[in-house]
C-alpha cells in the first residue's frame, strides 16, 4: 500500500512540475517575442486567389493596451492610421479628413482586408495568465526541435478559440508555429514564423504567415524590415490627436 501511495505522489509531483514547466516556457517565450514596448517597419501582404495586395507599414506598441499603425505605401493609402487604445480602435482616413471610432458591430470585420479581425487587435488576453498550459511533448518544426504545448482558456476568459497549440523552439524559446482551434475542435488557422534573424538586439522570426484553413488560397504575410524594443514611449503618444501625423 505504501508503495502505491509513493508512486502516486511521485506521479503527481512529476505532473505538477511538467505543467509548471509548460507555463514557464510560454512566459519566457512571450517576454522574448514581445518586449515592454516596440516600434518598427513591416511589409504586409494580403494574398487572395484573385490578387495580392501589399502595404508598407510603421507601427508602435506598448504592452498589450496600446498600438498605432501608419500606412507608408502605396500612395493611395499613405497616411491612413489605426489606433488601438485599450479596448477601443480608431481609423484616421486622410481622404475623408476624419477620425472614425469603430463600433462594436465592426469588430468582427477584417482588419485592413487581412486574415486578422479588428477584434484581434483589441483583445488583451495573456497566453501566460489566461490559459492553462499542458506539455504535449516535443516535435520538430523545420530544422528546430520544439516544445509542443497546449493552451486551454480558463473559465470566463473571453476568447474565440477553444484551444491553442504552440510549437516553441527549445533553444531560443521562439514561437515558430501556432494552431488555433474552433469550438468543434477543428483547426481554424495556422500561424507560422520563420526567417530567424537578429533584429533590435533580439533573435526573432522576421516573417509571419497566417493561413485560414477554411479559405483555400487565402493567407496574410508580415515581413519585418526593422524592429526596436523596450524604447521609452509615453501613453499619450497613443492618442487620436497624434493619428494625423505620428511623431515619437
For each feature predicted by the language model, list its residue ranges.
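Acidic/charged, solvent-exposed loop-and-adjacent secondary-structure segments enriched in E/D, K/R, S/T
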Residues: 94-123
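Hydrophobic h-region of N-terminal signal peptides that target proteins for export
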Residues: 8-18
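Short hydrophobic/aromatic-rich beta-strand segments that constitute the beta-sheet cores
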Residues: 40, 67-71, 89-93, 99-101, ...
